[in-house]
Swiss-Prot record:
GO terms for molecular function: magnesium ion binding; phosphoenolpyruvate carboxylase activity. Homotetramer. One of its GO terms (biological process) is tricarboxylic acid cycle. Belongs to the PEPCase type 2 family. This is Phosphoenolpyruvate carboxylase. It catalyses: oxaloacetate + phosphate = phosphoenolpyruvate + hydrogencarbonate. The lineage of its organism: Archaea, Thermoproteota, Thermoprotei, Sulfolobales, Sulfolobaceae. Transmembrane segments: none annotated. It comes from the Archaea.
Amino acid sequence: MRKIPRTMSTQHPDNARVPEWSRSEVISGESEVIEAYLAYEHYEVDEVMWDAEGKDVDTHVVRKLLTQYPEFFKEKILGRDIFLTYRIPNPKIEGAEKKVFAETMESIPITYDLAEKFFNTKPTPPVFEVILPFTTDYKELIAILKYYEVAIVNKENVKLVDDIYVKDLIGEINPKSIEIIPLIEDRDSMFKIDQIVGEYIKAMKPPYMRVFLARSDPAMNYGLISAVLSVKYALNRLGKIEKKYGIKIFPLIGVGSLPFRGHFNPMNFEKVIDEYRGVYTFTVQSAFKYDYEDNEVINAIRKINEREISEFELLDEEEEKILHRIANVYTSSYQPIIESLADVINKIALFLPRRRARKLHIGLFGYSRSTGKVTLPRAITFTGALYSIGIPPELIGISSLSTLTEKEWNVLEKNYKYIKHDLQAAARFVSYESIDLMKETWNVNEEIIKKIMEDLSYAENTLNIKIGDSNSVGRKHALISSLALIALKEGNIDEAKSYLLEMAKIRKSLG
């Protein structure tokens, strides 16, 4: 059995601080190659996700890694000891990126040839897995695998003229097949994960499977509680699929540093591992790596890599139904507030610092994200915008839990163990003064402000969550939030931008 990575370094632009080695505030181009190397060598992460989705991708990354750091990659073999995994555009959704999908897939055999030349022998394929975002149907997975086999590998046997074949011009094409990791990003797909993963296993009979569950985008689209419960439901179902088909499933989860996006950081990783039992691989995003002390980061990653993997937590049918109902109730309270705040969120998001060179995606779940009737920014800047105006998104919609029965509460607390811990971590950054300033500056509907106040009141009076923070961190963040909103009201954009960055540094993540 191959090694399955336990940590995956990603290019999510959630870092407030810029790493010392970066040539500019926006990490791009050659800096991302350096970043990939440092993820392996300095942080000792098992896997790097190379993102070809929504940005200018460098498909020559393997060539650059092998030529710039030959001694390291002779010791640590790509595809055996450490891994580089492409996140490809989904050609079904992202029309403008269809050819980028093709280009990225075509680069896989090139990486094989480079490794063959580098080692002077038949190598382990350095790249053999791809992540398919927004997977909603098992046939999409089969189509990607067949595309690689039919359109890329089989063309070596195409006859060009007389006895000259494609293989005679470009050589043999390897690897002959690849593996695919579905990335499940929407709530409906998580609740029907059997129809995606189960049907794929029935059709393709893989020896094992890695399944990637999003945690960040579902939070933005459906609210914190709905996102956590959707992932818990999906993990439970993956455990049942594993038993049913007798193949090992290795789940990945995409988690950021702040509670809304996963709460996975060097100070809280142990609780997150305990929360999401059965998960094999956790993402190590940019804020995790660059917004904490270096020794804290390295020690945390070492512990994550060395940990025991816990068993899946399986639910009975009634518990599954209750999770589904709570998720629906929560979302129906959360979404109208977000729709009403969309204008404010989009305006603030424009002034948060950019940390990656990204192209904008268009579409249902592209990088301009749609929830209900409005378009929102990326999840990172969405989260950062709400923190910046003193309304951590973790608390939006929370008063809907008042409708739960005692039994439903018990199921919720059993399946979201650290709910109060996460809410308390977020509630430190609530600022009533900023909420008042926001109301004045953008003329936000009074009814929406009332709903937000009901959520904060419920958190404080029913859940015993302390709102605001009397220590220096929370007070400083609240003060700077007010200053930022005053600067925006007066049209002092540069001043506001500096305040927004300062707040991000205080909370150790952009969003």
